Amino acid sequence: MVYPESFYNSISWTWYYADTATPTYNCLGFATGSRTWEWPSSFGSSSATKAQVDSYLSTLGYRPSTYDPFILAYGENVNSITHFSKVTGLEWCRAKWGQLELFNHGSHDPYYHSSYGALQIKYTAN
């Protein structure tokens, strides 16, 4: 791992190493399956609004829904989305942390609010 465990513990209360660090893709690129560095220019440099995320993900076949989520969006609030993960089970998700590693999480809401933020929006396939 790139950093000591204490670094990762400060971001999430439940994380399990899944794959090595790489700058070739990020959280959104992993969640959508593109495995590229995916951050539309309409999102701005660090966060996106719910309307921006809804619009972008709709072009990929996703819509907001509380049921059967495929992609989870995190942030300070619904109009400050900064991170995404891919649902892998009823309570599990997997996320790429920027240029850092890929991690499994034992919760759909695994982050401390001071880092990636809380779960804000769930997206399902159309």
Regions found by a protein language model. Give the residues of each.
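N-terminal capping segments
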Residues: 1-60
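Sequence-level detector for tyrosine residue identity
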Residues: 3, 8, 16-17, 25, ...
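Detector for Asparagine
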Residues: 9, 26, 77-79, 104, ...
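Generic structural signal for residues positioned in beta-strands
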Residues: 29-30, 71, 92, 121
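...with weaker cross-activation on analogous glycine-rich loops/strands in unrelated enzymes
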Residues: 45-101
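Aromatic- and glycine-rich peptidoglycan recognition patches
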Residues: 88-126
